[in-house]
């Protein structure tokens, strides 16, 4: 694995373990340092949480799922664009996730989120833009899903869930924000931009 991918995985694991420990020792209030709470940030509070939330996770399964995504798709993006651009997409997608969450949830004092999902979704979208033949394997779907179909379908579902204000413990706002920014930044950085993805849609649709 490339050093940058390994470094990001280790950073996520390290911060997540620190968050698990904080929760065990000090409870939910002590763990707020590891949470992005838009209502607090809007009032100039808990800026540390906004940063650490990018790398902290709610549990081992949450951490493992995100790191599996980063491991599976990060290598392809880094190989195609180089370390600097890979890290830029990862960071920009995380920031995009924060901006969408903040815009939609800053007035909700009960809203909290954490995890690298926004950044990881950005990397997944980058992999699909760079190579539209990429397939996405999901645990609850028996066959791999073509990357562009997943991209379009997940985007539509996320918008529906956000508009419906569904509260299911998943930050659909963050996922969508990370995916959109990851896609946009990749289009700007990739040598062929959107051309491979558009050709895929022309061929099959």
List PLM regions with ranges.
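A detector for small-residue-rich transmembrane helices and their helix-helix packing motifs
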Residues: 1-205
């Amino acid at each position: 694995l490339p050093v940058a991918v390994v470094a990001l995985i280790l950073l996520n694991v390290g911060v997540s373990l620190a968050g698990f420990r904080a929760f065990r020792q000090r409870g939910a209030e002590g763990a707020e340092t590891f949470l992005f709470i838009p209502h607090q940030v809007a009032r100039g509070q808990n800026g540390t949480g906004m940063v650490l939330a990018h790398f902290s996770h709610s549990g081992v399964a949450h951490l493992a799922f995100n790191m599996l995504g980063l491991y599976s798709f990060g290598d392809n993006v880094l190989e195609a664009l180089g370390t600097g651009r890979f890290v830029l997409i990862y960071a920009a997608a995380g920031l995009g996730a924060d901006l969408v969450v903040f815009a939609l949830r800053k007035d909700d004092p009960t809203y909290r989120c954490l995890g690298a999902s926004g950044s990881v979704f950005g990397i997944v979208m980058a992999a699909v833009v760079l190579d539209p033949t990429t397939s996405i394997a999901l645990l609850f779907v028996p066959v791999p899903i073509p990357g562009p179909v997943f991209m379009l379908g997940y985007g539509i579902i996320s918008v529906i869930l956000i508009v419906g204000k569904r509260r299911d413990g998943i930050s659909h706002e963050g996922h969508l924000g990370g995916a959109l920014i990851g896609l946009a930044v990749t289009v700007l950085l990739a040598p062929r931009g959107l051309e491979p993805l558009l050709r895929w849609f022309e061929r099959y649709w």
